[in-house]
A protein has these predicted regions:
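Interfaces and regulatory segments of ATP-dependent nucleotide/adenylate/phosphodiester-chemistry enzymes
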Residues: 107
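Long, low-complexity, Lys/Arg-enriched
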Residues: 1-101, 111-155
Length: 155
């Protein structure tokens, strides 16, 4: 379902937990700009500690937008076992009691990170009532390539 920012508040009235990833792409900010901050109880912001200097302050923007509701969680995507350990600890600590609605913004997670999150969401599915997954499409994945025929990922 395609939903614009004005419709977000109607579609997603509230969530107990919002999981997102800070990145260098401004797309990581799109959802938070369109939702009422009062509708989310707790926010988990994952970020790649190996590339935090490339984020153009997007991590700080997310932290500032969500305030005390947000927790920033560093992950090293260079080490697959670190990804699994960090996400495993997060789910163990945050799904020990029942959650209501979980909202996952998968827009800027790495493939590995997203697969591990989906694994844990499946493992802990009895610990939450509802899961909504949102994604903000990129306009162009091959921004350094001019020729449409050479834009292999955007095709």
């Amino acid at each position: 379902m395609n939903v614009n920012n004005m419709e977000l508040n109607l579609q997603i009235k509230s969530a107990d937990l919002y999981i997102c990833s800070a990145s260098f792409e401004s797309r990581c900010l799109a959802f938070t700009e369109g939702i009422s901050k009062d509708s989310i109880n707790y926010v988990a912001i994952f970020y790649n500690i190996d590339e935090v200097n490339c984020f153009d302050n997007n991590l700080q923007v997310l932290q500032q937008q969500w305030g005390k509701r947000a927790t920033s969680i560093p992950v090293s995507y260079k080490d697959a076992s670190n990804i699994a350990d960090v996400f495993g600890a997060f789910f163990k600590n945050n799904f020990s009691s029942q959650r209501g609605k979980v909202l996952l913004d998968c827009t800027t997670f790495t493939h590995e990170g997203l697969l591990i999150i989906l694994k844990y969401l499946n493992e802990y599915k009895s610990s939450y009532d509802e899961l909504n997954i949102i994604y903000n499409c990129a306009e162009d994945y091959s921004t350094n390539t001019v020729s449409v025929n050479e834009k292999w990922l955007t095709k």
